UniProtKB/Swiss-Prot annotation:
Stated name of the protein: Protamine-3
Superkingdom of the organism of origin: Eukaryota
InterPro entries reported in the protein's UniProt record: PRMP3 (IPR026077)
This protein's UniProt keywords: Chromosome, Developmental protein, Differentiation, DNA condensation, DNA-binding, Nucleosome core, Nucleus, Phosphoprotein, Spermatogenesis
Function: Protamines substitute for histones in the chromatin of sperm during the haploid phase of spermatogenesis. They compact sperm DNA into a highly condensed, stable and inactive complex.
Length: 101
């Protein structure tokens, strides 16, 4: 994977010296080709490795899922408390204003 990219990147080095505009165009095309080659090699060669990684990630995700509902409940409770506090403050505040006027 990396070796292919290295060869391509070194190949477009002298091309930039001959013409900057052409060099940039060719380098971009070669970069795209390099990326596509990496994707193909990853999808074909790395399937077995990815499966092992996914199993580890699933275990971590399960722990996160257990924590998310707890956080969600806390987040839901916080706005309710704020609203009730605002309502409590909002109701008595107009009363003194009325007495002043």
């Amino acid at each position: 994977m990396g070796s292919r990219c290295a060869k391509l990147s070194t190949g477009h080095g002298p091309a930039q010296n001959t013409g900057h505009s052409r060099g940039h165009e060719s380098s971009m095309k070669k970069l795209v080709a390099c990326v596509s080659q990496d994707n193909f090699s990853l999808s074909s060669e790395g399937e077995e490795e990815e499966e092992d990684e996914e199993e580890e990630e699933e275990e971590e995700e399960e722990e996160e899922e257990e924590q998310i509902p707890v956080k969600g409940k806390l987040l839901l409770l916080e706005p309710e408390k704020q609203e009730s506090a605002e309502d409590g403050e909002a109701q008595p505040s107009p009363e003194p204003k009325q007495t002043h006027s």
